[in-house]
């Protein structure tokens, strides 16, 4: 399957059309951003790491009965995916307090959240992805009540699957975001799951093993991503 025209260039991925109108090529670049794209740097191997990490996670979620857009890997940095009509709202699950939640509520980082929190954010970099709720989604027509309920159900199901997967690898799944779209009327998981869009801590040391290493200038970003992938059994080379 050959990629054709560039359709969209995001902060770390590029989307291309193919000869099949129902399929797209997703290319993972080496770019790493923080502050809604205000700070961007390149790291060798990052595109490959996130592409293969994403394929591994999407495969695990598909095995658990969660519909995903993933079709197959095409190269070290590219995969073939279904073309979705994307919902402009991100779903976030928080198992522990971190990031914006800590700043917003003034609570201690790392406290366990039971049951996990579920948040919605409008995908809009210029507005810094403002938090919204189900009422906003319905009023502004971003997604139907039924499809939003399905997105929430699938997000919690993914959390159940992934918490165990990471726990077995000696990691804490602190929080993560998912994006969904519609494929022939069905709610399907799209975009990606990688350490770029999740927080992962070492279970023993609480060392951060995700993009917070870049956001907080901790260093060792690629080494952390590779360590997480190895623990999970992701085939990299």
Swiss-Prot record:
**For this chain's UniProt record, which GO biological process terms are given?**
'de novo' IMP biosynthetic process; cobalamin biosynthetic process
The gene behind this protein is: purC
Q: Which UniProt keywords apply?
A: ATP-binding, Ligase, Nucleotide-binding, Purine biosynthesis
The Enzyme Commission number assigned here is: 6.3.2.6
Q: Does the keyword ATP-binding apply?
A: yes
Q: Which species does this protein come from?
A: Shigella sonnei (strain Ss046)
Q: Which InterPro entries match?
A: SAICAR_synt/ADE2_N, SAICAR_synt_PurC, SAICAR_synth, SAICAR_synthetase, SAICAR_synthetase_CS
Q: Name one GO molecular function term.
A: phosphoribosylaminoimidazolesuccinocarboxamide synthase activity
Family of the protein in this entry:
Belongs to the SAICAR synthetase family.
Pathway given in the UniProt record = Purine metabolism; IMP biosynthesis via de novo pathway; 5-amino-1-(5-phospho-D-ribosyl)imidazole-4-carboxamide from 5-amino-1-(5-phospho-D-ribosyl)imidazole-4-carboxylate: step 1/2
> Which NCBIfam families did the record assign?
purC
- UniProt key word Chloroplast: no
Q: Which PROSITE patterns match?
A: SAICAR_SYNTHETASE_1, SAICAR_SYNTHETASE_2
Gene3D superfamilies in the cross-refs: ATP-grasp fold, B domain, Phosphorylase Kinase, domain 1
Cellular component aspect of the GO annotation: cytosol
Q: Which domain of life is it from?
A: Bacteria
Catalytic reaction equation(s): 5-amino-1-(5-phospho-D-ribosyl)imidazole-4-carboxylate + L-aspartate + ATP = (2S)-2-[5-amino-1-(5-phospho-beta-D-ribosyl)imidazole-4-carboxamido]succinate + ADP + phosphate + 2 H(+)
Q: What is this protein called?
A: Phosphoribosylaminoimidazole-succinocarboxamide synthase
